[in-house]
Regions:
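Conserved AMP-binding/adenylate-forming core of the ANL superfamily
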Residues: 2, 11, 17-48, 90-91, ...
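Conserved AMP-binding A3 loop
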Residues: 32, 140-167
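Conserved AMP-binding/adenylate-forming
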Residues: 42-84, 180-183, 372, 411
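Conserved AMP-binding/adenylation subdomain of ANL enzymes
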Residues: 163-177, 185-226
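Gly/Ser/Thr-rich phosphate-binding loop
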Residues: 226, 238-297
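AMP-binding/adenylate-forming catalytic core of the ANL superfamily
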Residues: 227, 341, 346-439
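Conserved ATP/PPi-binding loop(s) of AMP-dependent carboxylate-activating enzymes
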Residues: 311-341, 371-373
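AMP-binding/adenylate-forming catalytic domain of the ANL superfamily
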Residues: 435-457
Length: 463
Protein backbone atom coordinates (compact mmCIF):
# COMPACT_ATOMS: atom_id res chain seq x y z
CA UNK A 1 0.00 0.00 0.00
CA UNK A 2 1.31 3.44 -0.92
CA UNK A 3 2.45 5.39 2.13
CA UNK A 4 0.91 8.80 2.84
CA UNK A 5 3.36 11.68 2.85
CA UNK A 6 2.70 15.11 4.42
CA UNK A 7 5.26 16.76 2.12
CA UNK A 8 5.21 16.88 -1.68
CA UNK A 9 7.21 18.87 -4.20
CA UNK A 10 4.22 21.13 -4.79
CA UNK A 11 3.56 21.81 -1.10
CA UNK A 12 7.28 22.38 -0.48
CA UNK A 13 7.48 24.95 -3.28
CA UNK A 14 4.47 26.75 -1.83
CA UNK A 15 6.15 26.80 1.58
CA UNK A 16 9.40 28.18 0.16
CA UNK A 17 8.21 31.76 -0.19
CA UNK A 18 6.73 34.27 -2.61
CA UNK A 19 5.77 32.49 -5.81
CA UNK A 20 4.89 35.38 -8.10
CA UNK A 21 8.41 36.80 -8.43
CA UNK A 22 10.36 33.57 -9.00
CA UNK A 23 10.50 31.92 -12.41
CA UNK A 24 11.30 28.66 -14.12
CA UNK A 25 12.77 29.71 -17.46
CA UNK A 26 12.92 27.25 -20.35
CA UNK A 27 14.34 27.46 -23.85
CA UNK A 28 11.14 28.87 -25.33
CA UNK A 29 8.86 29.61 -22.38
CA UNK A 30 8.77 30.58 -18.73
CA UNK A 31 6.34 30.58 -15.83
CA UNK A 32 6.30 31.69 -12.23
CA UNK A 33 6.47 29.00 -9.58
CA UNK A 34 3.01 30.19 -8.58
CA UNK A 35 1.64 29.37 -12.02
CA UNK A 36 3.33 25.97 -11.90
CA UNK A 37 1.99 24.89 -8.49
CA UNK A 38 -1.54 25.97 -9.44
CA UNK A 39 -1.51 24.57 -12.97
CA UNK A 40 -0.71 21.58 -15.13
CA UNK A 41 0.61 20.86 -18.59
CA UNK A 42 -0.86 17.35 -18.66
CA UNK A 43 -3.83 16.57 -20.89
CA UNK A 44 -5.85 15.14 -18.01
CA UNK A 45 -6.90 16.03 -14.49
CA UNK A 46 -4.06 15.24 -12.05
CA UNK A 47 -6.35 13.03 -9.92
CA UNK A 48 -6.76 10.66 -12.88
CA UNK A 49 -3.12 9.67 -12.35
CA UNK A 50 -3.45 8.92 -8.64
CA UNK A 51 -1.59 5.76 -7.68
CA UNK A 52 -0.27 5.15 -11.19
CA UNK A 53 3.28 4.66 -12.41
CA UNK A 54 4.10 7.44 -14.87
CA UNK A 55 7.03 7.36 -17.29
CA UNK A 56 8.22 10.81 -18.43
CA UNK A 57 9.95 10.63 -21.83
CA UNK A 58 10.26 14.20 -23.00
CA UNK A 59 12.58 16.37 -25.04
CA UNK A 60 11.89 19.51 -23.04
CA UNK A 61 13.20 20.23 -19.53
CA UNK A 62 10.68 22.95 -18.70
CA UNK A 63 7.70 20.68 -19.31
CA UNK A 64 9.30 17.73 -17.54
CA UNK A 65 9.83 20.00 -14.52
CA UNK A 66 6.23 21.17 -14.64
CA UNK A 67 5.01 17.57 -14.82
CA UNK A 68 7.03 16.59 -11.74
CA UNK A 69 5.34 19.33 -9.72
CA UNK A 70 1.96 17.87 -10.65
CA UNK A 71 2.86 14.20 -10.23
CA UNK A 72 4.80 14.08 -6.97
CA UNK A 73 2.34 13.24 -4.21
CA UNK A 74 -0.22 11.84 -6.67
CA UNK A 75 1.56 9.17 -8.71
CA UNK A 76 2.84 5.97 -7.14
CA UNK A 77 6.03 6.20 -9.15
CA UNK A 78 7.57 8.64 -11.64
CA UNK A 79 10.28 7.49 -14.05
CA UNK A 80 12.59 10.10 -15.59
CA UNK A 81 13.68 8.87 -19.03
CA UNK A 82 16.55 11.11 -20.24
CA UNK A 83 16.46 12.19 -23.89
CA UNK A 84 19.94 10.78 -24.57
CA UNK A 85 18.88 7.23 -23.63
CA UNK A 86 17.97 5.21 -26.71
CA UNK A 87 14.27 4.50 -27.18
CA UNK A 88 15.39 0.90 -27.69
CA UNK A 89 15.47 0.76 -23.87
CA UNK A 90 11.98 2.23 -23.43
CA UNK A 91 10.17 -1.12 -23.28
CA UNK A 92 12.67 -2.52 -20.77
CA UNK A 93 12.37 0.55 -18.54
CA UNK A 94 8.58 0.59 -18.78
CA UNK A 95 8.32 -3.10 -17.94
CA UNK A 96 10.83 -2.95 -15.08
CA UNK A 97 9.14 0.10 -13.55
CA UNK A 98 5.63 -1.31 -14.15
CA UNK A 99 4.70 1.89 -15.95
CA UNK A 100 1.07 2.22 -17.01
CA UNK A 101 1.13 5.85 -18.22
CA UNK A 102 3.54 7.44 -20.70
CA UNK A 103 3.80 11.23 -20.72
CA UNK A 104 5.73 12.56 -23.70
CA UNK A 105 6.12 15.31 -26.26
CA UNK A 106 7.92 12.92 -28.58
CA UNK A 107 5.89 11.19 -31.29
CA UNK A 108 8.62 8.60 -31.76
CA UNK A 109 8.41 7.65 -28.08
CA UNK A 110 4.61 7.56 -28.22
CA UNK A 111 4.69 5.18 -31.20
CA UNK A 112 7.50 2.97 -29.90
CA UNK A 113 6.94 -0.60 -28.72
CA UNK A 114 6.70 -0.07 -24.97
CA UNK A 115 3.57 -1.90 -23.84
CA UNK A 116 2.04 1.16 -22.12
CA UNK A 117 -1.68 1.60 -22.76
CA UNK A 118 -2.27 5.18 -21.62
CA UNK A 119 -0.31 7.85 -23.48
CA UNK A 120 -0.55 11.53 -22.61
CA UNK A 121 0.93 14.29 -24.73
CA UNK A 122 1.99 17.57 -23.17
CA UNK A 123 -0.02 20.73 -23.45
CA UNK A 124 2.07 23.63 -24.73
CA UNK A 125 0.92 25.90 -21.90
CA UNK A 126 0.38 25.66 -18.16
CA UNK A 127 -3.37 25.47 -17.52
CA UNK A 128 -4.87 26.30 -14.09
CA UNK A 129 -6.20 23.26 -12.21
CA UNK A 130 -8.12 22.86 -8.93
CA UNK A 131 -5.88 23.36 -5.92
CA UNK A 132 -7.32 20.59 -3.70
CA UNK A 133 -5.23 17.49 -4.49
CA UNK A 134 -6.49 15.22 -1.68
CA UNK A 135 -4.11 12.98 0.26
CA UNK A 136 -0.46 13.18 -0.76
CA UNK A 137 1.39 9.94 -1.44
CA UNK A 138 5.10 9.27 -1.03
CA UNK A 139 5.97 9.03 -4.71
CA UNK A 140 8.96 6.98 -5.82
CA UNK A 141 11.28 8.87 -8.18
CA UNK A 142 13.12 6.56 -10.59
CA UNK A 143 16.40 7.79 -12.06
CA UNK A 144 18.24 5.95 -14.81
CA UNK A 145 21.93 5.23 -14.49
CA UNK A 146 24.30 3.30 -16.72
CA UNK A 147 24.45 -0.48 -16.51
CA UNK A 148 27.29 -2.83 -17.39
CA UNK A 149 25.04 -4.90 -19.70
CA UNK A 150 24.00 -1.91 -21.79
CA UNK A 151 20.58 -1.75 -20.16
CA UNK A 152 20.13 1.20 -17.79
CA UNK A 153 19.71 0.55 -14.08
CA UNK A 154 16.70 2.10 -12.35
CA UNK A 155 17.59 3.70 -9.00
CA UNK A 156 14.73 4.37 -6.57
CA UNK A 157 14.65 7.69 -4.71
CA UNK A 158 12.02 9.73 -2.90
CA UNK A 159 11.64 13.48 -2.65
CA UNK A 160 13.15 13.20 0.81
CA UNK A 161 16.36 11.54 -0.35
CA UNK A 162 16.74 13.84 -3.35
CA UNK A 163 15.95 17.09 -1.56
CA UNK A 164 17.73 16.50 1.75
CA UNK A 165 20.69 18.74 0.92
CA UNK A 166 18.37 21.47 -0.43
CA UNK A 167 16.31 21.54 2.75
CA UNK A 168 19.58 21.81 4.67
CA UNK A 169 20.29 25.28 3.23
CA UNK A 170 17.88 28.22 3.12
CA UNK A 171 19.82 31.09 1.53
CA UNK A 172 18.68 34.66 1.11
CA UNK A 173 17.02 33.87 -2.18
CA UNK A 174 15.81 37.27 -3.30
CA UNK A 175 18.69 37.94 -5.68
CA UNK A 176 19.67 34.37 -6.60
CA UNK A 177 19.07 32.96 -10.09
CA UNK A 178 20.21 29.37 -10.54
CA UNK A 179 21.15 27.61 -13.76
CA UNK A 180 22.93 24.44 -14.78
CA UNK A 181 24.48 22.88 -17.84
CA UNK A 182 23.01 19.56 -16.69
CA UNK A 183 19.77 18.06 -17.92
CA UNK A 184 17.27 17.80 -15.06
CA UNK A 185 16.41 14.21 -16.02
CA UNK A 186 19.88 13.31 -14.70
CA UNK A 187 20.82 13.46 -11.02
CA UNK A 188 23.09 16.51 -11.37
CA UNK A 189 20.37 18.58 -13.04
CA UNK A 190 17.54 17.27 -10.89
CA UNK A 191 19.47 18.24 -7.77
CA UNK A 192 19.76 21.84 -8.99
CA UNK A 193 16.10 21.93 -10.05
CA UNK A 194 15.03 20.83 -6.57
CA UNK A 195 17.50 23.17 -4.89
CA UNK A 196 16.03 26.15 -6.76
CA UNK A 197 12.42 25.05 -6.33
CA UNK A 198 12.71 24.39 -2.60
CA UNK A 199 14.88 27.33 -1.55
CA UNK A 200 12.95 30.14 -3.19
CA UNK A 201 15.04 30.99 -6.25
CA UNK A 202 14.51 31.30 -9.98
CA UNK A 203 15.98 28.71 -12.35
CA UNK A 204 17.09 28.91 -15.99
CA UNK A 205 17.23 25.45 -17.58
CA UNK A 206 19.39 24.57 -20.56
CA UNK A 207 18.30 22.93 -23.80
CA UNK A 208 19.92 20.33 -26.02
CA UNK A 209 18.64 22.42 -28.95
CA UNK A 210 20.90 25.40 -28.25
CA UNK A 211 24.67 25.66 -28.71
CA UNK A 212 26.80 26.48 -25.68
CA UNK A 213 27.23 30.08 -26.85
CA UNK A 214 23.46 30.61 -27.06
CA UNK A 215 22.94 29.14 -23.60
CA UNK A 216 25.62 31.40 -22.13
CA UNK A 217 23.98 34.42 -23.76
CA UNK A 218 20.54 33.42 -22.46
CA UNK A 219 21.87 32.71 -18.96
CA UNK A 220 23.60 36.08 -18.92
CA UNK A 221 20.47 37.86 -20.12
CA UNK A 222 18.48 36.36 -17.22
CA UNK A 223 21.10 37.40 -14.68
CA UNK A 224 22.19 33.94 -13.57
CA UNK A 225 24.15 34.17 -10.31
CA UNK A 226 24.62 30.48 -9.43
CA UNK A 227 25.49 27.81 -11.99
CA UNK A 228 26.64 24.19 -12.02
CA UNK A 229 28.09 21.70 -14.46
CA UNK A 230 30.69 19.01 -14.95
CA UNK A 231 34.35 19.88 -15.54
CA UNK A 232 33.75 18.98 -19.20
CA UNK A 233 30.84 21.42 -19.32
CA UNK A 234 33.11 24.14 -17.98
CA UNK A 235 36.01 23.34 -20.32
CA UNK A 236 33.63 23.62 -23.26
CA UNK A 237 32.16 26.86 -21.89
CA UNK A 238 35.60 28.42 -21.45
CA UNK A 239 36.39 27.69 -25.10
CA UNK A 240 33.41 29.84 -26.11
CA UNK A 241 34.03 33.52 -26.91
CA UNK A 242 30.82 34.21 -24.94
CA UNK A 243 32.09 32.80 -21.63
CA UNK A 244 32.29 36.35 -20.32
CA UNK A 245 28.56 36.98 -20.86
CA UNK A 246 27.79 35.36 -17.51
CA UNK A 247 29.04 36.81 -14.23
CA UNK A 248 28.27 34.13 -11.63
CA UNK A 249 28.71 34.64 -7.91
CA UNK A 250 28.81 30.88 -7.29
CA UNK A 251 30.06 28.01 -9.46
CA UNK A 252 29.71 24.31 -8.69
CA UNK A 253 31.46 21.45 -10.47
CA UNK A 254 30.50 17.79 -10.09
CA UNK A 255 29.98 14.57 -12.03
CA UNK A 256 33.61 14.04 -13.03
CA UNK A 257 36.98 14.30 -11.33
CA UNK A 258 37.84 17.97 -10.86
CA UNK A 259 41.52 18.59 -11.60
CA UNK A 260 43.56 21.62 -10.60
CA UNK A 261 43.74 22.92 -14.16
CA UNK A 262 39.99 23.43 -14.50
CA UNK A 263 39.73 24.95 -11.02
CA UNK A 264 42.43 27.47 -11.93
CA UNK A 265 40.96 28.22 -15.35
CA UNK A 266 37.44 28.82 -14.02
CA UNK A 267 38.83 30.99 -11.24
CA UNK A 268 40.80 33.04 -13.78
CA UNK A 269 37.69 33.60 -15.92
CA UNK A 270 35.40 34.33 -12.96
CA UNK A 271 37.66 35.76 -10.22
CA UNK A 272 34.76 37.04 -8.10
CA UNK A 273 32.88 33.73 -7.98
CA UNK A 274 32.93 31.29 -5.09
CA UNK A 275 33.90 27.96 -6.62
CA UNK A 276 33.08 24.56 -5.15
CA UNK A 277 33.39 21.02 -6.38
CA UNK A 278 30.91 18.47 -5.14
CA UNK A 279 30.98 14.72 -4.85
CA UNK A 280 27.60 13.24 -5.76
CA UNK A 281 26.21 10.28 -7.66
CA UNK A 282 22.79 8.97 -8.64
CA UNK A 283 22.98 6.13 -6.14
CA UNK A 284 24.88 7.82 -3.28
CA UNK A 285 23.35 11.29 -3.44
CA UNK A 286 25.31 14.39 -2.43
CA UNK A 287 28.32 13.53 -0.29
CA UNK A 288 30.27 16.73 0.27
CA UNK A 289 31.35 20.09 -1.14
CA UNK A 290 34.97 21.26 -1.33
CA UNK A 291 35.56 25.01 -1.39
CA UNK A 292 39.28 25.50 -0.70
CA UNK A 293 40.24 25.88 -4.36
CA UNK A 294 42.18 22.62 -4.47
CA UNK A 295 41.50 19.34 -6.23
CA UNK A 296 40.81 16.36 -3.98
CA UNK A 297 39.52 16.69 -0.43
CA UNK A 298 40.91 16.75 3.13
CA UNK A 299 40.39 13.60 5.27
CA UNK A 300 38.22 15.48 7.76
CA UNK A 301 35.61 15.84 5.00
CA UNK A 302 34.71 12.18 5.62
CA UNK A 303 33.39 12.99 9.10
CA UNK A 304 32.32 16.63 8.77
CA UNK A 305 28.59 16.01 8.27
CA UNK A 306 27.08 13.84 11.04
CA UNK A 307 24.17 12.91 8.74
CA UNK A 308 26.50 11.31 6.18
CA UNK A 309 28.79 8.38 6.95
CA UNK A 310 31.72 7.93 4.57
CA UNK A 311 34.65 5.58 4.53
CA UNK A 312 37.47 4.49 2.26
CA UNK A 313 37.52 0.73 1.85
CA UNK A 314 39.86 -1.09 -0.54
CA UNK A 315 40.69 2.29 -2.05
CA UNK A 316 37.05 3.08 -2.89
CA UNK A 317 34.70 5.68 -1.41
CA UNK A 318 31.58 4.28 0.28
CA UNK A 319 28.65 6.33 1.59
CA UNK A 320 25.71 5.72 3.93
CA UNK A 321 23.10 8.44 4.45
CA UNK A 322 19.46 9.39 4.05
CA UNK A 323 20.39 10.86 0.65
CA UNK A 324 21.14 7.53 -1.01
CA UNK A 325 18.78 5.67 -3.31
CA UNK A 326 17.04 2.74 -1.65
CA UNK A 327 17.41 0.05 -4.31
CA UNK A 328 17.45 -0.78 -8.01
CA UNK A 329 14.19 -1.87 -9.61
CA UNK A 330 14.12 -5.26 -11.33
CA UNK A 331 14.37 -8.81 -10.05
CA UNK A 332 17.73 -9.36 -11.77
CA UNK A 333 19.28 -6.06 -10.72
CA UNK A 334 22.30 -6.04 -8.38
CA UNK A 335 22.08 -4.89 -4.78
CA UNK A 336 22.48 -1.12 -4.54
CA UNK A 337 23.80 -1.27 -0.96
CA UNK A 338 25.93 -3.73 0.97
CA UNK A 339 24.76 -5.51 4.11
CA UNK A 340 25.74 -2.46 6.20
CA UNK A 341 23.64 -0.13 3.99
CA UNK A 342 26.71 1.53 2.44
CA UNK A 343 26.69 2.45 -1.26
CA UNK A 344 29.90 1.53 -3.05
CA UNK A 345 30.44 4.53 -5.33
CA UNK A 346 33.01 2.76 -7.52
CA UNK A 347 35.16 5.90 -7.32
CA UNK A 348 38.75 5.18 -6.31
CA UNK A 349 40.79 7.51 -4.12
CA UNK A 350 44.40 7.78 -3.03
CA UNK A 351 45.86 9.49 0.06
CA UNK A 352 48.87 11.66 -0.78
CA UNK A 353 50.55 14.10 1.58
CA UNK A 354 47.55 14.37 3.88
CA UNK A 355 44.87 14.81 1.20
CA UNK A 356 42.65 12.39 -0.69
CA UNK A 357 42.59 12.53 -4.48
CA UNK A 358 40.14 10.81 -6.80
CA UNK A 359 42.01 8.62 -9.26
CA UNK A 360 39.19 7.31 -11.44
CA UNK A 361 36.49 4.70 -11.76
CA UNK A 362 37.23 1.17 -10.61
CA UNK A 363 35.76 -0.20 -13.85
CA UNK A 364 37.65 2.27 -16.08
CA UNK A 365 41.23 1.15 -15.47
CA UNK A 366 43.53 0.54 -18.45
CA UNK A 367 45.75 -2.51 -17.95
CA UNK A 368 49.16 -1.94 -19.56
CA UNK A 369 51.13 -5.15 -19.22
CA UNK A 370 49.87 -5.70 -15.68
CA UNK A 371 50.23 -2.06 -14.64
CA UNK A 372 47.04 -0.16 -13.83
CA UNK A 373 46.43 3.23 -15.41
CA UNK A 374 43.54 5.52 -14.49
CA UNK A 375 42.68 7.62 -17.59
CA UNK A 376 41.65 10.55 -15.39
CA UNK A 377 45.10 10.72 -13.79
CA UNK A 378 46.75 11.08 -17.19
CA UNK A 379 44.13 13.62 -18.32
CA UNK A 380 44.81 15.74 -15.23
CA UNK A 381 48.46 16.02 -16.30
CA UNK A 382 47.70 16.72 -19.97
CA UNK A 383 45.11 19.35 -19.01
CA UNK A 384 47.78 21.29 -17.12
CA UNK A 385 49.71 21.85 -20.35
CA UNK A 386 49.32 25.55 -21.17
CA UNK A 387 48.10 24.91 -24.72
CA UNK A 388 45.56 22.17 -23.89
CA UNK A 389 41.85 22.91 -23.50
CA UNK A 390 40.71 19.37 -22.69
CA UNK A 391 41.71 15.76 -23.25
CA UNK A 392 40.40 12.20 -23.31
CA UNK A 393 42.67 9.29 -22.47
CA UNK A 394 41.70 5.83 -23.66
CA UNK A 395 43.05 2.36 -24.30
CA UNK A 396 44.40 1.03 -27.58
CA UNK A 397 44.63 -2.72 -27.96
CA UNK A 398 48.13 -4.18 -28.05
CA UNK A 399 49.12 -7.81 -28.80
CA UNK A 400 52.10 -7.44 -26.46
CA UNK A 401 50.88 -5.53 -23.40
CA UNK A 402 47.13 -6.01 -23.82
CA UNK A 403 46.57 -2.27 -24.02
CA UNK A 404 48.42 0.99 -24.55
CA UNK A 405 47.54 4.51 -23.47
CA UNK A 406 46.58 7.05 -26.15
CA UNK A 407 45.10 10.53 -25.82
CA UNK A 408 42.78 12.73 -27.86
CA UNK A 409 43.61 16.38 -27.19
CA UNK A 410 41.73 19.60 -27.94
CA UNK A 411 44.00 22.64 -28.05
CA UNK A 412 43.22 26.14 -26.89
CA UNK A 413 42.98 28.78 -29.62
CA UNK A 414 46.58 29.69 -30.41
CA UNK A 415 48.00 33.15 -30.99
CA UNK A 416 50.25 31.75 -33.69
CA UNK A 417 50.34 28.59 -35.76
CA UNK A 418 52.54 25.82 -34.43
CA UNK A 419 53.52 22.57 -36.04
CA UNK A 420 51.32 19.69 -34.94
CA UNK A 421 54.35 17.44 -34.46
CA UNK A 422 55.97 20.00 -32.17
CA UNK A 423 52.81 20.28 -30.08
CA UNK A 424 52.49 16.51 -29.76
CA UNK A 425 56.13 16.23 -28.74
CA UNK A 426 55.74 19.00 -26.18
CA UNK A 427 52.70 17.34 -24.60
CA UNK A 428 54.50 13.98 -24.47
CA UNK A 429 57.53 15.56 -22.79
CA UNK A 430 55.19 17.21 -20.30
CA UNK A 431 53.65 13.80 -19.52
CA UNK A 432 57.02 12.06 -19.26
CA UNK A 433 58.14 14.55 -16.64
CA UNK A 434 55.05 13.89 -14.48
CA UNK A 435 54.04 10.26 -15.04
CA UNK A 436 55.47 6.77 -14.77
CA UNK A 437 56.52 5.39 -18.15
CA UNK A 438 53.55 3.00 -18.52
CA UNK A 439 51.14 5.92 -18.02
CA UNK A 440 52.63 8.14 -20.74
CA UNK A 441 50.52 8.06 -23.93
CA UNK A 442 52.13 6.35 -26.90
CA UNK A 443 50.22 8.71 -29.19
CA UNK A 444 48.68 12.17 -28.98
CA UNK A 445 45.83 12.77 -31.42
CA UNK A 446 44.97 16.43 -31.94
CA UNK A 447 41.20 16.66 -32.45
CA UNK A 448 38.83 19.63 -32.93
CA UNK A 449 36.41 18.52 -30.22
CA UNK A 450 35.52 15.73 -27.79
CA UNK A 451 32.10 14.17 -27.40
CA UNK A 452 30.29 15.16 -24.22
CA UNK A 453 27.17 13.15 -23.41
CA UNK A 454 23.88 14.60 -22.17
CA UNK A 455 25.09 13.63 -18.70
CA UNK A 456 27.80 16.26 -19.11
CA UNK A 457 30.56 13.69 -18.94
CA UNK A 458 33.14 12.80 -21.56
CA UNK A 459 31.94 9.82 -23.58
CA UNK A 460 34.37 7.01 -22.85
CA UNK A 461 34.51 3.93 -25.04
CA UNK A 462 36.70 1.15 -23.75
CA UNK A 463 38.82 -0.79 -26.21
Amino acid sequence: MQKANPVSLRSSIIASGTLSTRFLVGFDTKATWGELVNGSILDCAPEELRGKCVLLATTDQFRASAALIVLDGIARRVVLFPPDVSLDHLAYVANTAEANVLVTDNAEAANAQHGIDQILMYSRTVTPVPVDRGEQLETEWILLTSGTTGQPKLAVHTLGSLADSAWETRPNAASIVWSTFYDMRRYGGLHIFLHAALTGTSLVVSSALEPVADFLLRAGAHGVTHISGTPSHWRRALMSPWAGRIAPEYIRMSGEIVDQAILNQVNAQYPYARIEHTFASTEAGVGFNVSDGLMGFPPEMLTRNPKIEMKIEDGTLKIRSTRTATRYLGSKSPALKDTSEFVDTGDTVELREGRYYFTGRRDGIINVGGFKVHPEEVEAVINRHPQVAMSLVKAKKSPITGALVVADVVLKPLNGEKEADALRSGILRFCSAELDAHKVPVAINLVPMLTIGESGKLVRRHA
